[in-house]
Regions:
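Sequence/structural signature of beta-propeller domains
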Residues: 1-250
């Protein structure tokens, strides 16, 4: 969410950036207006394709400084595990960074979650336990030397899909997909302590078995007034949907 411009930035796992403007009526989400779309490009201007284009998470910089036009986008990628900075038009601003902490992540279980913390800077999370880490536990880390052990939620198949900052806390989105068990989406609060310690509180858990209209929720951002936007990935499947959901925490 870009507070200065009131725009929602989205990234696809096929290497596209999309800028949109959510529409609200009486504080309820009523629609989404597309603004523009751009291909992500490498440092030589070549559009990213194939496994190199598998973008997963997005974090903004200079998005709430009261100045339009200077927003930078940090994008994390799976399969070729790396981070890279871009302009909103998809132009690369720097060579990719390959964090050592992503070593051991499975090809499609890498840096799925990312946000900017006011004290720690960029905080990234691996979707699932990397090699050498206990089951049901994954890793949060900074680009420095800080690492935290993150215990995943109880539902079978839980995986970390996104992070967003909420003051000095983090909000985490998890998805549990393990058929024939119901699809479960969990929203959790994280308080980072002295690495590797942290405290976690589960704020809400939504199960398709209870009648909730859910899908593959992988995006999470916080609006300026505290409302949350959740976005699903349809996996390019005609059987799934891309959903945008607005929640207001109590």
């Amino acid at each position: 969410w870009e507070g200065d411009a009131g725009l929602l930035h989205m990234v696809s796992d096929r290497g596209w950036l999309h800028r949109t403007r959510p529409r609200f009526e009486a504080e309820h989400l009523s629609g989404l207006s597309p603004i523009d779309s751009h291909r992500l490009r490498d440092t030589d201007g070549t559009p990213l394709e194939g496994s190199a284009a598998d973008a997963e998470s997005l974090s903004l910089r200079h998005d709430t400084n009261g100045k339009l036009g200077d927003t930078e986008l940090w994008v994390s990628f799976e399969r070729d595990h790396r981070l890279q900075r871009f302009r909103p038009d998809g132009t690369s601003l720097a060579a990719p960074i390959r964090p050592e902490q992503a070593t051991g992540a499975a090809a499609n279980k890498g840096m799925e979650a990312m946000t900017r913390h006011p004290e720690h800077g960029l905080v990234l999370g691996l979707e699932s336990p990397p090699r050498g880490v206990a089951p049901k536990e994954t890793r949060l880390f900074t680009l420095g030397d800080q690492e935290w052990r993150y215990p995943l939620a109880a539902p079978t198949g839980s995986a970390l899909t996104e992070l967003t900052a909420d003051g000095n806390d983090l909000l985490a989105l998890e998805r549990a997909f393990a058929p024939p068990a119901p699809l479960v989406i969990s929203l959790r609060r994280i308080r980072l302590g002295e690495p590797p310690e942290l405290d976690i509180e589960t704020l809400a858990s939504f199960s398709s078995g209870d009648g909730w209209w859910l899908d593959n929720m992988e995006g999470l951002t916080r609006l300026s007034d505290g409302r949350l936007l959740l976005l699903s990935d349809d996996n390019a499947s005609p059987l799934q949907r891309s959903l945008l959901v607005c929640l207001r925490p109590r």
